[in-house]
Amino acid sequence: MITGSIVAIVTPMHEDGSLDLNSFRNLLDFHVQEGTDAIVVVGTTGESPTVNVEEHCELIKIAVDHVAGRIPVIAGTGANSTAEAIELTEFAKKAGANMALSVVPYYNKPTQEGLYRHFKAIAEAVELPVILYNVPGRTVADMSNDTILRLAEVPGIVGVKDATGNIDRACDLIARAPKDFALYTGDDMTAVATISLGFHGDISVTANVAPRLMHEMCVAAASGDIAKAREIHFKVLALHRDLFCEANPIPVKWAVHKLGLMPNGIRLPLTTLSEANQPRVLAALRQAGLVA
């Protein structure tokens, strides 16, 4: 089971929106060197809705090949079409990804039975461990804990990323999930709380700019060193908050750019961070000790 801080890595782009694959490789090295425990590539933060299928597959392949087994690579393979999700998951397996992260289908609003059949079909079609991803703030459809736990019994479905930020729901999953079913928060703000209670890790946006701190925070929370986890939490608290001052990944891409790690490119319909919010994100980077 993968534990700790798992970065939901951004996808570097030039200012014209084209992929910057050299910066992408450098970012992968940066995370390996800074202690990130695993990498999710082409997830929400990686702008999966605005890369085409060819680019999506290219990014997965580059990540797997460049990381070369140094840490696990989890491929974002979700889609609002079951057939497309299966195709992406099949590619991830062939590319050598360790796992797939598959988001709840968005826009078409499936029922709980539809969600069950969707993820079951993926797991049955491809022999690659699948992590479910529930983020109702984006997908509208909200996968219930009952459906998650029903899917936990399906061979090949090995965990869930719960991005609801709801502690009550997290506690219910901890109490009822099989012991070998991985529980990850997708909400940095509640990472210390959920990991302290029994979650296994954090699939993190903040880790894009503070990988070492997020790794240390997750390790401290998991080991019961609440004083250290609390200290780091408050050091990065403004990042947890202000990296969402506009829609993710707008603020975090600007922040990674300010650290000198990539150009300031993003694809429409997303636009770069507004001038009004730039001082806010810069102040959060300063509070975390990441810039002077």
Curated annotation (Swiss-Prot):
GO terms for biological process: diaminopimelate biosynthetic process; lysine biosynthetic process via diaminopimelate. GO terms for cellular component: cytosol. Pathway: Amino-acid biosynthesis; L-lysine biosynthesis via DAP pathway; (S)-tetrahydrodipicolinate from L-aspartate: step 3/4. GO terms for molecular function: 4-hydroxy-tetrahydrodipicolinate synthase activity. InterPro entries: Aldolase_TIM (IPR013785), DapA (IPR005263), DapA-like (IPR002220), Schiff_base-form_aldolases_AS (IPR020625), Schiff_base-form_aldolases_CS (IPR020624). Its EC number is 4.3.3.7. Keywords: Amino-acid biosynthesis, Cytoplasm, Diaminopimelate biosynthesis, Lyase, Lysine biosynthesis, Schiff base. It comes from Dechloromonas aromatica (strain RCB). The active site is at Y133, K161. It comes from the Bacteria. Homotetramer; dimer of dimers. Pyruvate binds at T45, I203. Catalyzes the condensation of (S)-aspartate-beta-semialdehyde [(S)-ASA] and pyruvate to 4-hydroxy-tetrahydrodipicolinate (HTPA). PROSITE patterns: DHDPS_1 (PS00665), DHDPS_2 (PS00666). HAMAP family: DapA (MF_00418). Belongs to the DapA family. The record marks T44, Y107 as: Part of a proton relay during catalysis. The keyword Lyase applies. It catalyses: L-aspartate 4-semialdehyde + pyruvate = (2S,4S)-4-hydroxy-2,3,4,5-tetrahydrodipicolinate + H2O + H(+). This is 4-hydroxy-tetrahydrodipicolinate synthase. It is found in: Cytoplasm.
